[in-house]
């Protein structure tokens, strides 16, 4: 998969932000993921729509290994169609929406959230837009 978007934040993640990815699901199956990373190399949150099984999977990679997957069978995405995926966070969970429909709620496994300093979007699908939006204090001291 190709790196389509990467953002760094020296101040780290805080509740109240959202990441929205819009594109067209025109490539092969299972070629899209979003990763929230720490400076230590952990993946604090990994979300991947799996077209082959019509599921959305959330997980975390900490201490050199993957945790237990959380899987949602709510899957409003279709290959060959435009898509929108949004990930937002509050103090307890990541919330994942696809086509404006909530598909997964994933509890924070990595704390403090401020140690999450990078977000990457990898995709072989055509992406039209990737946007980080603030709702109050979000990424550290306001810097992306």
UniProtKB/Swiss-Prot annotation:
Residues 5-133 form the Galectin domain. CDD domains: GLECT. Lens-specific. Located at the interface between lens fiber cells (at protein level). GO terms for molecular function: carbohydrate binding. The modification Phosphoserine is found at residue 138. Keywords: Lectin, Phosphoprotein. Homodimer. This is Grifin. It comes from Rattus norvegicus (Rat).
